[in-house]
Amino acid sequence: MQSRFTFLATRTLKSTTTKAKNRTFSSSTVESSTKQPPQFSQTLAGLRARLAVESPTLSDFIHLQSNNTYSVEVGTKKKPLPKPKWMREAIPGGEKYVQIKKKLRELKLHTVCEEAKCPNLGECWSGGETGTATATIMILGDTCTRGCRFCNVKTSRTPPPPDPNEPTNVAEAIASWGLDYVVITSVDRDDLADQGSGHFAETVHKLKTLKPNMLIEALVPDFRGDRGCVEKVAKSGLDVFAHNIETVEELQSSVRDHRANFKQSLDVLMMAKEYAPPGTLTKTSIMLGCGEAPEQVVKTMEKVRAAGVDVMTFGQYMRPSKRHMPVSEYITPDAFEKYKTLGMEMGFRYVASGPMVRSSYKAGEFYIKSMIESDRSVSSQLPIS
């Protein structure tokens, strides 16, 4: 696995060094247009050295902290402070929202939008600025075998067995909506021999058979790091393989279930890159406001990028209920924007970063859709060797 990591890191850095070497985001540095840019080695250390010269640095985030513009306090348990204005959610509504909710009830489908109390539910289901409604479908039931401290999905050691007809029913239901891009996710199913990977792969395959041109993002669990499970899903016909690391490396044990960890999640994303057909994107997401420090976020971004991940999203952690892990702070839009700038300079193909952004946020889906279509258009014009 170490050799695979080295290969991905080298390939990633080679593909991004050229396009970024002439750009700078340091407000205190003005480089002459005639000065030759420094050369950096094609390693993780080289990536860090280049970013120190060309991108927002930790001092930028520390400056935000010292000016009280990095985050806003949440108050105490007895005296909580009101949410900042940028965290106020819109009330769900609209004709499309009502139609989708009714359709989901008729088909007995579960969505992570509802189960996880996503703050963007109203925007995504009503169509938002794009006018196209989207929903993230959750398969393998509505009960998870794990108990992460941030998640609102109900848990059980022995959830009901999966519905064998679900792959067909879900595929037919989604195909009937006429969507261009859909996200399919699932709960963890540690109780199943294959962690639910076969059920997941079957759902994707059947949907792709019905709608060959539909772009499918699969937001999958870690399958306990099982290579065979990852391979099965990666080869199922999906367009985007997504798996969330959820938080920085240092907070994994206090935020996620004890069966999940940072290395295992990175391994899953690297395996997906290995097994999926060329052109398949990999994607991950982390929450901010869990108690992480800026330097931990930057270090996590470096490792994720060196693992070959194409897309990364950042959003504000929101406590689903008083039973869940408390929010440590509300990160400001300015700080989120700096993480986005840094991520693009690192070489991620797309970064969605904002207080209300979630891993399957609709604005990101449309951008990824256009990116995939552009890649395929270019690929189709290349001569066959």
From Swiss-Prot:
It holds the Pfam family Radical_SAM. Its cofactor is [4Fe-4S] cluster. Residues 129-349 form the Radical SAM core domain. PROSITE patterns: RADICAL_SAM. The keyword Cell wall biogenesis/degradation does not apply. Disulfide bonds: none annotated. [4Fe-4S] cluster 2 binds at residues 144, 148, 151. Binds 2 [4Fe-4S] clusters per subunit. One cluster is coordinated with 3 cysteines and an exchangeable S-adenosyl-L-methionine. Gene3D superfamilies: Aldolase class I. Belongs to the radical SAM superfamily. Lipoyl synthase family. This protein may be expected to contain an N-terminal transit peptide but none has been predicted. This is Lipoyl synthase, mitochondrial. It comes from Populus trichocarpa. The gene is LIP1.
